[in-house]
């Protein structure tokens, strides 16, 4: 899996920049920006690696002796380290603008290895800095830039923005039999819109969203003039894929879930978002159809979903009424999924380190 990085400017972003000469060359000039340490700790917990990148005009010259820089800088690094903040690398350009070097921000010389490795998650990596050159660096790297400002985009705001999860996925699946469009928002409730062409199936899918505590939009055009087989099967495949994508790296999720009774039915559902597809299913129905949905396709739907979502799923129901038996399965799955996808921490719930 590619790595999320934060490339962070030093003066004016991590520590205050003296307005008189823009040099932190004495200990009394060293002051941290408000909230920087707790927010960096939060960002590390969210899986970001930190890289400091800074222009230090004329470092090592008479106007800015190396020793004057080293004292405050080393103290700053010691304080960061003592509080648990770890920088993978500190990148410094010591040149003046007149030197026309190739390593001064916004040029990308200092960060070339991150661009070449193809191991950086560009969609979720950022440059954070207080100057236009930092934003230009981000553009040159092909990632997003965040313009730090104590009032308009301070460290608590940045921490909230980058750790807030909007777990969303959009999957389009087109075959000769079906055209399916699925969108899933795991952290939003209500407003689901579902149209598969099979009315009772729409109702069942809505039960998953309602009891799962998330929103989804599903539009399906299938070969219903034949039967509902391809429509139900392919919807399960597309929905499972969307749920898997929306879960992302699964960091902090509960992972497991359980059971739900309904009316005279007792539905049992056990779910493990394990990365290992498996379905155990036990349900018997009196009739071949409930509404316009084939009862034999219910198992097929959950098997398809568990396969593409990568989950271990156990489903069982018993009761007297087919409608209630079917509905109990979908409600139980939704309620169980609600528990399993809930975020309650920052760590991956696996001793293997991968799900």
From Swiss-Prot:
Claim: Transferase is one of the keywords in the record: no
Obligatory cofactor(s): Mg(2+); Zn(2+)
Location, primary (coarse class): cytoplasm
Binding site for Mg(2+): 9, 11, 130
Subcellular location(s) per record: Cytoplasm
Span list, region Imidazoleglycerol-phosphate dehydratase: 167-355
Enzyme Commission numbers on file: 3.1.3.15, 4.2.1.19
Gene3D superfamilies, A to Z: HAD superfamily/HAD-like, Imidazole glycerol phosphate dehydratase, domain 1
Family to which this protein belongs: In the N-terminal section; belongs to the histidinol-phosphatase family. In the C-terminal section; belongs to the imidazoleglycerol-phosphate dehydratase family.
PANTHER family, per database record: IMIDAZOLEGLYCEROL-PHOSPHATE DEHYDRATASE, IMIDAZOLEGLYCEROL-PHOSPHATE DEHYDRATASE HIS7
Name under which the protein is recorded: Histidine biosynthesis bifunctional protein HisB
Organism: Escherichia coli (strain K12)
Lineage: Bacteria, Pseudomonadati, Pseudomonadota, Gammaproteobacteria, Enterobacterales
Gene: hisB
């Amino acid at each position: 899996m590619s790595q999320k990085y934060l490339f962070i400017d030093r003066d004016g972003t991590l520590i205050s920049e003296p307005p008189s000469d823009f040099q932190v060359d004495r200990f009394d000039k060293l002051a941290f920006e408000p909230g920087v340490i707790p927010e960096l700790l939060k960002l590390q917990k969210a899986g970001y690696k930190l890289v400091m990148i800074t222009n230090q005009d004329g470092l090592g010259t008479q106007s800015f002796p190396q020793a004057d820089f080293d004292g405050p800088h080393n103290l700053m690094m010691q304080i960061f380290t003592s509080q648990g903040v770890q920088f993978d690398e500190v990148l410094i350009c010591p040149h003046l603008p007149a030197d026309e070097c190739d390593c001064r921000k916004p040029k990308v010389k200092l960060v070339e290895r991150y661009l070449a490795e193809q191991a950086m998650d560009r969609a979720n990596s950022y440059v954070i800095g207080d100057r236009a050159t930092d934003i230009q660096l981000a553009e040159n790297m092909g990632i997003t830039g965040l313009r730090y400002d104590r009032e308009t985009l301070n460290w608590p705001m940045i921490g909230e923005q980058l750790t807030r999860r909007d777990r969303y996925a959009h999957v389009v699946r087109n075959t000769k039999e079906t055209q399916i469009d699925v969108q899933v928002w795991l952290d939003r409730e209500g407003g689901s819109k579902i149209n598969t062409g099979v009315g009772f199936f729409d109702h069942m899918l809505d039960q998953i969203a309602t009891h799962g505590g998330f929103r989804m939009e599903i539009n399906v055009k299938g070969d219903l003039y034949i039967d509902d087989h391809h429509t139900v099967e392919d919807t399960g495949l597309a929905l499972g894929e969307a749920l898997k994508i929306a879960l992302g790296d699964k960091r902090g999720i509960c992972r497991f879930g359980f059971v739900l009774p309904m009316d005279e039915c007792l539905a049992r559902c056990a779910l493990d978002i394990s990365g290992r597809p498996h379905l155990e299913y036990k349900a018997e129905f009196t009739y071949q159809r409930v509404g316009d949905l084939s009862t034999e396709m219910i198992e097929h739907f959950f098997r398809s979903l568990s396969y593409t979502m990568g989950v271990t799923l156990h489903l069982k129901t018993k009761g007297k009424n087919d409608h209630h038996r079917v509905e109990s399965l979908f409600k139980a799955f939704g309620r169980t999924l609600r528990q399993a996808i809930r975020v309650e921490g920052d760590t991956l719930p696996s001793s293997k380190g991968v799900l």
